[in-house]
């Protein structure tokens, strides 16, 4: 995982020395498409994503739920992220860059801004007409996809309904800080103190979610919402990846009946299932983080995957 500095690629891991061993995620820089007047146009936008990344996964889920596969084209990165960051080099599940012809994701960023400085991440929502990055913040891209294409043929369904927004926002805030990002804060910590600061709140949140789901089918109200969509990619990767690779090993999701049920329900959803590729995700995490797993060995297990999943999912 490197970064661009004034448009020049640098292969550099995260700096944790200046933060006491803590992993600090930088904010996304492209935040367009959120104004009230924004309307989607079929064929105008292109998504850069990948099966490994949980942030991209939530966007792939929303794209599928809204039936936008024909309206928003996609490129999918290689599982392996090495000295050049994310790539479109040939490999399993890769969909080449048909828009900018990039071999490396950083070339998409420099196509938008030759002097860009910052991390090079997915997902990216690219505007083909203006030849620029519209947005690279996953939480905002899913909001765009949720409603911006409703008047041009998207499937019905509002996953951020007005009546539930305060509750969705409340759950999202805790889940992001302690769980979605918490697994990274645990896994990329370089001091014991920083690791434990992330570790214990993570499991407090899992315990809280398990209790919250008692007698409930979904996190908010009686329907699938954005809160479930944002939680699911972390849960689906947890036992096979985060439990071992990121040292989040107090409990498994399999030890939480209600959370396991939620995973099974979404993993078996006809539109969500094709977005899951656990084999690809395992290959990425275990093979692309030499500071965490120097040998690059990919574990075979778990022996009993979560409901709706297989080791080849």
Curated annotation (Swiss-Prot):
Keywords: Oxidoreductase
Catalytic activity, as annotated: 2-(glutathione-S-yl)-hydroquinone + glutathione = hydroquinone + glutathione disulfide
PROSITE patterns: GST_CTER (PS50405)
Top class in the EC scheme: oxidoreductase
GO molecular function terms listed in the Swiss-Prot or TrEMBL record: glutathione transferase activity; oxidoreductase activity
Gene3D superfamilies assigned: 1.20.1050.10, Glutaredoxin
Active site positions: 53, 184
CDD domains reported for this sequence: GST_C_Omega_like (cd03190)
GO cellular component, one term: cytoplasm
Binding positions (glutathione): 86, 119-122, 137-138
The EC number(s) this enzyme carries: 1.8.5.7
Oxidoreductase listed as a keyword: yes
Residues in GST C-terminal domain copies: 161-285
Consequence of gene loss (knockout): Disruption mutant does not have GS-hydroquinone lyase activity, is more sensitive to PCP toxicity and has a significantly decreased PCP degradation rate.
Subunit architecture: Homodimer.
Its job: Catalyzes glutathione (GSH)-dependent reduction of glutathionyl-hydroquinones (GS-HQs) to the corresponding hydroquinones. Can act on halogenated substrates such as GS-2,6-dichloro-p-hydroquinone (GS-DiCH) and GS-trichloro-p-hydroquinone (GS-TriCH). Involved in the degradation of pentachlorophenol (PCP), a toxic pollutant.
Family classification: Belongs to the GST superfamily. Xi-class GSH transferase family.
Name used for this protein in its record: Glutathionyl-hydroquinone reductase PcpF
Naturally occurring in which organism (per UniProt): Sphingobium chlorophenolicum
Top-level taxonomy: Bacteria, Pseudomonadati, Pseudomonadota, Alphaproteobacteria, Sphingomonadales
Gene: pcpF
């Amino acid at each position: 995982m490197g970064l661009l500095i004034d448009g020049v690629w640098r292969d550099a891991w995260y700096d944790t020395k200046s933060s006491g061993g803590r992993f600090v995620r930088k904010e996304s820089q492209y935040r367009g498409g959120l104004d009230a007047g924004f309307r989607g146009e079929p064929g105008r936008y292109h998504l850069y994503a990948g099966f490994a990344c949980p942030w991209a996964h939530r966007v792939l889920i929303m794209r599928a739920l809204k039936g936008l596969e024909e309206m928003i084209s996609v490129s999918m990165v290689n599982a392996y992220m090495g000295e050049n960051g994310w790539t479109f080099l040939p490999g399993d599940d890769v969909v080449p860059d048909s828009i900018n012809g990039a071999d490396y994701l950083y070339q998409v960023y420099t196509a938008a801004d030759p002097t860009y400085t910052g991390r090079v991440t997915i997902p990216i929502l690219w505007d083909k007409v203006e030849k620029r990055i519209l947005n690279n913040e996953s939480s905002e891209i899913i909001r765009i996809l949720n409603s911006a294409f409703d008047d041009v043929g998207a499937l019905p369904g509002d996953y951020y309904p007005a009546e539930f927004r305060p509750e969705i926002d409340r759950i999202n805030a805790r889940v992001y800080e302690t769980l979605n990002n918490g697994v990274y804060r645990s896994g990329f910590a370089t001091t014991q103190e920083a690791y434990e600061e992330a570790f214990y709140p993570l499991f407090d949140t899992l315990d809280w979610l398990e209790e919250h789901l008692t007698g409930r089918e979904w996190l908010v109200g009686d329907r699938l919402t954005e809160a479930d969509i944002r939680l699911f990619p972390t849960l689906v990767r947890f036992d096979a990846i985060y439990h071992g690779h990121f040292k989040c090993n107090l409990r498994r999701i399999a030890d939480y009946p209600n959370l396991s049920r939620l995973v099974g329900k979404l993993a078996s959803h006809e539109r969500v299932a094709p977005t899951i590729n656990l084999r690809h995700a395992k290959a990425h995490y275990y093979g692309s983080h030499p500071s965490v797993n120097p040998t690059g060995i990919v574990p075979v297990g778990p022996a009993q995957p979560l409901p709706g999943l297989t080791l080849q999912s």
